[in-house]
UniProtKB/Swiss-Prot annotation:
NCBIfam families assigned to the protein according to its UniProt record, in alphabetical order: GroEL, PRK00013.1, PRK12849.1, PRK12850.1, PRK12851.1
Residues annotated as signal peptide: none
Name of the protein this chain belongs to: Chaperonin GroEL
EC assignment: 5.6.1.7
GO biological process, any: protein refolding
Chemical reaction(s) catalysed: ATP + H2O + a folded polypeptide = ADP + phosphate + an unfolded polypeptide
CC annotations in GO: cytoplasm
PROSITE patterns: CHAPERONINS_CPN60
UniProt keyword list: ATP-binding, Chaperone, Cytoplasm, Isomerase, Nucleotide-binding
Binding site for ATP: 29-32, 86-90, 413, 492
Subcellular localization(s) per the UniProt record: Cytoplasm
Similarity field: Belongs to the chaperonin (HSP60) family.
Amino acid sequence: MAKQIIFGEKVRVSLKKGVDTLANTVRVTLGPKGHPVALERKWGAPTVIDDGVTIARDIELPDAFENMGAQLVKEAATRTSDAAGDGTTTSIVLAQAIINEAFKNIAAGAEPINLKRGIEKAVAALKAQLRKNSTPVKGKQQIVQVATITGKDPEIGNLIADVMDKVGKDGVITIEESRGLRYETSYVEGMQFDRGYISAYFVTDPGRMESVMEDATILMTDRKIETVAELLPALEKILQISKNLVIVAENVEAEALATLVVNKLRGNLNILAVKAPGYGDRQKAMLEDMAILTGGHVISKEAGRKLDSVTEADLGHARRIVSNKDKTTIIDGEGSAEAIKDRIKQIKAQIEETESAFDREKLQERQAALVGGVAVIAVGAATETEMKERKARVEDALAATRAAIEEGILPGGGTGLLNALPCLDALKLEGDEATGVNIVRKALIEPVRWIATNAGKDGNVIVDKVKNSPVGHGYNAENDVFGDMAEMGIIDPTMVVRSALENAASIANMVLITDSLVADIQEKAPAAPGPEAAGMY
């Protein structure tokens, strides 16, 4: 296909238009008084949502060059969401501010590479300062505060805190849709392991890049499956029993994987293939744990069994299995409670006997997986649109809470970034590198400015007041007051703030040093033939 190419100033104009279109759409959601955005759906009612990354993912622009700018900023939000689960809108706002200010300086003669170096040095100093300013999460009340701010609902904050209190900070928590009208929590047998789907073609929820299997039948083996010949006899037997199959194997590759993917895409099979966790003897033990939890048996090389020997009794069962690229969660396995208790006792005995600290740690992880179970938060609402919006907020709140526990917290509402600003004064740079630092300095006020603007206030006035306030003091947009953000319960996870800044700067740097764009020339579809004239054949 023929290409169209643009250079220089035209590149910056197109990229800026794309960046601004996406950022202007998303930034209205920032803060407690931000406004939701309605997303059109091919079928049914539009989705009304205030989650930055979900909105960004839905945006495609008709102009190819402008769309490149939008997609690059979308990448900043996606990376932030993957790393911290929240802060996606902040990341987009920061990226837009850095890009627009950098383009002004490039138009005035600044060298993009030197601006990039200055921006990188400023961000490195800010990240170190953010970690220095961070404080650990103390007690259940701060967990409530973090989850409430991200979920924009005190009920969500209390819900997350209660569930974490029961399953522990590292416990497995899953979020499901419910037919009810409110939030419900339950605790079921289950486990999670750090292996995801083998191929992205198994994804059933493209928005979250997850494969979800309801009423799953599970085939577990420590074998590597490579050919259709070894897989087909087992599949024919299993599909007479269940249409929802999850294969957990050492690996599924080559011809066997291609066959599963093709049949999945054609709708012939509802299937998910996942790599077995661990290696060697530990893999065998973890597969055995899984078999006991789900009421099945492992098709094991040691026992001399092949896949074609599988019987109905070998298959495990679970109410639900959720898998992404990194981990898989088995929820409500149908294994015998007595068998699970016996397995836990066996692992406890091994923990007491082992002299290896490493082995003890791995055994304790296995024990925790069997003992802890899985907490399930079921999200209900009066309509499907409201339910999906609520579910997204609960997911964000859970991710932000985990981030806060991992890296600590900072004053919220954009105050954490403003408090870190003085560290930039110590950077003694010259020329365009110093300009790069000033670009970041100007960008850091934008989150506070937009939180205030979305609350109906003059953003610049609010920024000036926050800058002149004591460290840790900021603007509470919910109640329209200034004060100590921590005391008011307005806190942000350090990981969220750091990731938002880091990813915004990274994407902005890519945009500002780009000097040519290449895109396909879209061929116009041929016009439909008109009706034939009367009397002609």
